Amino acid sequence: PLYHMNGLAICKVAFAGHLGIVLLPQFDAKEYISAIEKYKVTWLTSVAAMMAMVVREGDLLSTTNLSSVRIVRMGSAPVSEQLVRDIKRILPNAKITNGYGTTEAGPVVYGQHPEGLAQPDISVGYPIANIARLVDGNNVNAQYGELHCKNPAVMPGYNKLPEKTKEAFSEDGWYKTGDIMRSDENGFHYFVGRVDDMFNCGGENIYPSEVEKMLERHSEIEQACVVPVTDQIKGFKPVAFVVRREGSDLSEDGIKQYALANGPAYQHPRVVSFVEKLPLTGTNKIDRKRLDARSESARKRDK
């Protein structure tokens, strides 16, 4: 959407280069693919869920020329390694980048590595000095924690919401994004999840995106979304909504066993529901609230 930071930033880049912009009334995977060929689009910007829907259109992709695409830039949600591989398969000429920014603090948070190291495909980039930091409790130079930002683009506050504004800033004036990041050995950051998406299962903190990435490494899983349901003993437990790849007959038990073999036991989904596609919000992110509402029936199945 043009009222979000990504839409605004990309428009500025295009206008600065005297380039045209293709705007669609709403996202539809088939129309998106057709527009790329019709207008010979060179740069795509999207949310990961959009590209996950695009790569599923095998029949249309096989008859459409997408060779014009040189850059695919994603943001606003975690990107899995499997999705990157799928995009490279259908867009072999394209460079894939994963970006980050917030409407409250602008798009300039991450940049190039000072030693020229290549950005890993699923990383959001290297933090710009004095603009981004990871905070874990009193540690403001953490390797794993909430991302805080401070730069000239940071908003003065939310309009007529003084309490929400106060909650959004640290005592020393940094904007608290609510996004959990981790840093690798080279200093690149990776999106882990949202502070408000995290839930506790039997004393263990679970970030849904970590479980989703693990599940999406399975060769027969196209997409996965994990939401919590209440549990009298554990507090909350994970439930997974899964889109299988075409032709797959992967079972619920097969997914549970895969999760137990490839991640901590507490992360494995107690119930798996198969869906044709995941619901999206108006900003093309996965609509977790709608899945939350559907997870109650899944909770009853696990009793």
Give residue spans per PLM region.
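Conserved ATP/PPi-binding loop(s) of AMP-dependent carboxylate-activating enzymes
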Residues: 126-129, 138-168, 204-206
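Conserved AMP-binding/adenylation subdomain of ANL enzymes
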Residues: 3-42, 57
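Acidic/polar alpha-helix N-cap and adjacent early helical turns
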Residues: 293-303
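Beta-strand->loop->alpha-helix junctions that form or flank phosphate-binding loops
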Residues: 96-104, 123-127, 227-230, 273
